[in-house]
């Protein structure tokens, strides 16, 4: 991937930084999750997986969450990729950010010491005619149940506990997130990680 290691002409400093990180198999979710962000992350995951399906991808997350459909597109692409995807919470991993953090490869999910993780019920607004609202509400109920099931699978908690704990905003410190099962390790230095594994 030598062409990716040379900054492209016309890129600003921020673009060059993210391009350099990409060349090191590091991708970054540092904003609200929307369709544009999801398309970019999915493309990056697919590119890196095609380039070397045996090497880990590192996904750093500092996000307030966002669109359910966009987040699920990222999740499905993570599952599709043959390589392990290590996830790192830094700053805040809230809502869909928490979901993607916990969806990382088991044993390779990390939180920085002062990261905060937020779990709550998926949020969705419904508009339109009464019939449209009923259809949207039914679809929202389906995806909410699926996210509860997946979060239970990620964390090892029961679906019932996930539902109860998601009823209102619930914040976790890094240590609490570790105990709950969102992450596997709390790290303070990159040197403690070798080949995606905490030492």
Curated annotation (Swiss-Prot):
Its EC number is 3.4.21.92. GO terms for cellular component: cytoplasm; endopeptidase Clp complex. One of its GO terms (molecular function) is ATP-dependent peptidase activity. Fourteen ClpP subunits assemble into 2 heptameric rings which stack back to back to give a disk-like structure with a central cavity, resembling the structure of eukaryotic proteasomes. InterPro entries: ClpP, ClpP/crotonase-like_dom_sf, ClpP/TepA, ClpP_His_AS. This is ATP-dependent Clp protease proteolytic subunit 2. Cleaves peptides in various proteins in a process that requires ATP hydrolysis. Has a chymotrypsin-like activity. Plays a major role in the degradation of misfolded proteins. The active site is at 95 (nucleophile), 120. It comes from Mycolicibacterium paratuberculosis (strain ATCC BAA-968 / K-10) (Mycobacterium paratuberculosis). It is found in: Cytoplasm. The keyword Protease applies. It catalyses: Hydrolysis of proteins to small peptides in the presence of ATP and magnesium. alpha-casein is the usual test substrate. In the absence of ATP, only oligopeptides shorter than five residues are hydrolyzed (such as succinyl-Leu-Tyr-|-NHMec, and Leu-Tyr-Leu-|-Tyr-Trp, in which cleavage of the -Tyr-|-Leu- and -Tyr-|-Trp bonds also occurs). It is an enzyme of class 3 (hydrolase). Belongs to the peptidase S14 family. Transmembrane segments: none annotated. SUPFAM superfamilies: ClpP/crotonase. Pfam families: CLP_protease (PF00574). GO terms for biological process: protein quality control for misfolded or incompletely synthesized proteins. Keywords: Cytoplasm, Hydrolase, Protease, Serine protease. The keyword Hydrolase applies.
